[in-house]
């Protein structure tokens, strides 16, 4: 697009909310699958459907995911790498961005960050539902953006899940 040509974007960072998660989660992979437990905002509820028929089975984030988490933790913000963006809207957005980068903008990097509920969103939810203040979420995103700008490649550190 014209905006991409004018600004020579280097990275795309998408942000979505994952209510129930207790910290910031930086997504590592998006899969080519839509399967919604509930309808989306347009009332659509896909079942076992590929996002793109001509797309790869999955795309890995090309942002420095582990560096982003490291910067957030250094700022005392709960954060971790996530290995599933789910099969709902957030995964769909991440997948489509990485597909577009793969097909049209190979010079760009892209990825996705999930943020928790805000405290005021949990008022009518079960006691103990995780949340995070908006100021901390904003600081986490600042840390993530700084990591993207300062790190062309990711750090080599262990961050895998046991299950």
Per-segment meaning from a language model:
Residues 11-13:
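Structural motif
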Residues 142, 148-163:
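SAM-dependent methyltransferases
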Residues 1-7:
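Short, small-residue-biased leader/transition segments that mark boundaries at the very start
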């Amino acid at each position: 697009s014209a905006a991409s040509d004018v600004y020579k974007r280097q990275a795309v960072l998408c942000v979505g909310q994952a209510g129930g998660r207790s910290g910031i989660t930086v997504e590592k992979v998006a899969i080519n699958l839509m399967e919604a437990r509930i309808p989306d905002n347009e009332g659509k509820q896909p079942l076992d459907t590929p996002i793109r028929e001509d797309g790869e089975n999955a795309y890995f984030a090309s942002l420095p995911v582990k560096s982003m988490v490291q910067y957030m933790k250094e700022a005392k913000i709960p954060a971790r790498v996530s290995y599933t963006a789910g099969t709902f809207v957030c995964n769909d957005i991440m997948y489509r961005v990485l597909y577009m980068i793969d097909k049209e903008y190979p010079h760009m990097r892209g990825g996705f960050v999930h943020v928790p509920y805000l405290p005021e969103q949990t008022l009518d939810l079960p006691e103990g539902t995780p949340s995070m203040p908006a100021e901390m979420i904003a600081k986490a995103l600042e840390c993530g953006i700084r990591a993207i700008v300062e790190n062309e490649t990711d750090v080599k550190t262990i961050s895998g899940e046991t299950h």
